[in-house]
Amino acid sequence: MLATIDPIALRLGPISIHWYAICIVSGLLLAVYLAQRLAPEKGINPEHILDFILLAFPIAIVGARLYYVIFQWSYYSQNPSEIFAIWNGGIAIYGGLIAGAAVLYWFAKRHAIAVLDFLDIAAPGVMIAQSIGRWGNFVNQEAYGKAVSQLNYLPEIIRQQMFINGSYRVPTFLYESLWNLVGFSIILGLRYFNKGLRQGDVTSFYLIWYGLGRFVIEGMRTDSLMFVGLRVSQWVSISIIILGAVLLYFRKQRQKADYKMKN
């Protein structure tokens, strides 16, 4: 039987580099690379992408941590010294997305960039970054599901890491990682095979796809807050699914109106 993975990947004297941080930074770098490659298609200066990331990333991390702490307040109110111990894990993707979206809106308006264009080039990278980032949860043994008798369909290294508190746990991190990877692949396929994508289509797909997957997978977890019969993140998922559907509908209606005006 394999030992569990040490959350610390590398120690350099007093400095410890965690796998969690490596996963987040790796996803971020890939997201930046993709967005910079896509930016010229929308007439956006690729340098704006790096400027945006340097501003948005720390704010998104704070938002993700704040979201997590708020919904785990019963624990952190008793352990206030751990509120800032982000290296131990404990950030909520939705908190980061909300904070990041707010910064994106402000940044786009400041630089006279269409918000939907900015979102369209950001969405593919965000999705693959989320896929990679979930492996940080894997190493930290968090964001898992209910106890099960066995996980024989998985490689030994994943089975062992999902043996938590005396039981195997449903690897919800893996399900979400794969779901996001599939979504990323679909976006690439849509971009390659469908040259008629409208402004906002990629953003709508991201919101609906990610929201659906997160809603289902969140229902398998056992470590998140309940509210009116559902987990808080499931309510947020419903909200972003509706947002994506509404955006898709109104963009379609606008396209029809533009077509009638031209004819």
From Swiss-Prot:
What family name appears in the similarity comment?
A: Belongs to the Lgt family.
What are the entry keywords?
Answer: Cell membrane, Membrane, Transferase, Transmembrane, Transmembrane helix
The record, for NCBIfam families, names:
lgt
Its GO CC terms?
plasma membrane
Q: Which InterPro entries match?
A: Lgt (IPR001640)
This chain belongs to the protein called Phosphatidylglycerol--prolipoprotein diacylglyceryl transferase
* Localization per Swiss-Prot or TrEMBL: Cell membrane
Q: Name one GO molecular function term.
A: phosphatidylglycerol-prolipoprotein diacylglyceryl transferase activity
Q: Which organism is it from?
A: Streptococcus thermophilus (strain CNRZ 1066)
Gene of origin?
A: lgt
Look up and give the membrane topology term. Multi-pass membrane protein
What job does this protein perform?
Catalyzes the transfer of the diacylglyceryl group from phosphatidylglycerol to the sulfhydryl group of the N-terminal cysteine of a prolipoprotein, the first step in the formation of mature lipoproteins.
List where the protein spans the membrane. 15-35, 52-72, 83-103, 112-132, 170-190, 200-220, 227-247
Q: What is its EC number?
A: 2.5.1.145
KW Cell membrane (keyword) present = yes
Q: In which pathway does it act?
A: Protein modification; lipoprotein biosynthesis (diacylglyceryl transfer)
Source domain of life: Bacteria
Name its GO BP terms in alphabetical order: lipoprotein biosynthetic process
Which stretches are annotated as coiled coil?
none
Q: Where does a 1,2-diacyl-sn-glycero-3-phospho-(1'-sn-glycerol) bind?
A: 134
Q: What class of enzyme is it?
A: transferase
